Every structure is written in structure tokens, then in C-alpha cells.
Design a protein with these regions (language model features):
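Short beta-strand-to-loop elements that line the ligand-binding cleft
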Residues: 40-41, 57-69
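Short amphipathic alpha-helical signal-transduction/dimerization elements
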Residues: 34, 132-136
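A short structural motif in glycosyltransferase catalytic domains
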Residues: 16, 64, 82-85
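Secondary-structure junction motif
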Residues: 22, 34-57, 85, 121
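A bilobed periplasmic-binding-protein/Venus flytrap-type ligand-binding module shared by bacterial periplasmic
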Residues: 15-23, 109-120
Length: 137
């Protein structure tokens, strides 16, 4: 397997509905996150992400499979999630706000992983270069 770093140690944000009382905050302390109603992607292993956030294995976290389900739950049910700060001014959703997470012990990184026998074509190489440039601006 090969790993290509796309973005390293990017700041964390709390994504929540504009209707959520948290939406009025300018920032949120990292320590406060585990007190919130959280929703996460099911494909994250506990020790890889939730453990880093300080959640206990018995916390009641809503798990979803896809981005649409995640955004629907955030918009309609006052759930929140922790994500990587986007590289553009566009929000994840016009009905949500992104609140900076302060005092986090780490940022979030993104990597492209592929089998070492696979050779990316020229178009894919251009895409990877452009994506890296977006995150590094």
C-alpha cells in the first residue's frame, strides 16, 4: 500500500445546525465536545478517532454510513460532528455553521491510499497535485 499525504494537521471544526444553540458561539473548547450529542461516520474505528476525541467506549454516539445522513441528522436533530476545516469558504451545508475547535491536542490529516501495484494515470496525478495545493493555501 502507498500513502500520499494530502493535508496534514488541519484545524478541527464542530459542524452543527444554525438552529442549534451552539451556533451562536465563536469557538468551542475541545474538552466540551464529548458533552455534546455527536454523530460520526461508522467507518471510523473507535481508537482511531473517537478515542482521540476523548469519548468513552460507552458514549451514545449516532453512527451513519454517508455524508447525506450525517448532514440530515445535524440539520434536523441538533447533532454535531467534528470535521477537518474546509479548504474553501464554502460550507458543508448552507443550513450549518462551522465552529472552530480550540485547544485540541491534534489536527486532522488526510491521505490518499492505494495499492502499490496501481499506477495513477496523468489525470489522477494532476487531481492529486490540485487537491494538495487547495489544502496548502
Amino acid at each position: 500500500m502507498k500513502l500520499i499525504p494530502i493535508a496534514k494537521s488541519k484545524p478541527l471544526i464542530l459542524l452543527t445546525s444554525k438552529k442549534n444553540p451552539l451556533a451562536l458561539r465563536r469557538e468551542i473548547e475541545f474538552e466540551r465536545i464529548r458533552e455534546l450529542r455527536c454523530i460520526m461516520y461508522e467507518n471510523f474505528k473507535f481508537e482511531e478517532w473517537l478515542g482521540i476525541l476523548g469519548f468513552e467506549d460507552d458514549n451514545k454516539i449516532l453512527y451513519v454510513f454517508d455524508r447525506g445522513g450525517l448532514l440530515d441528522a445535524i440539520k434536523q436533530s441538533n447533532y454535531s460532528t467534528v470535521m477537518m476545516k474546509r479548504f474553501s469558504d464554502m460550507s458543508y451545508s448552507s443550513e450549518c455553521v462551522e465552529i472552530p475547535v480550540v485547544n485540541a491536542p491534534c489536527g486532522m490529516s488526510a491521505y490518499l491510499m492505494y495499492h502499490s501495484a496501481y499506477v495513477p494515470n496523468p489525470r489522477e496525478k494532476i487531481f492529486i497535485r490540485q487537491l494538495k495545493a487547495l489544502f496548502n493555501d
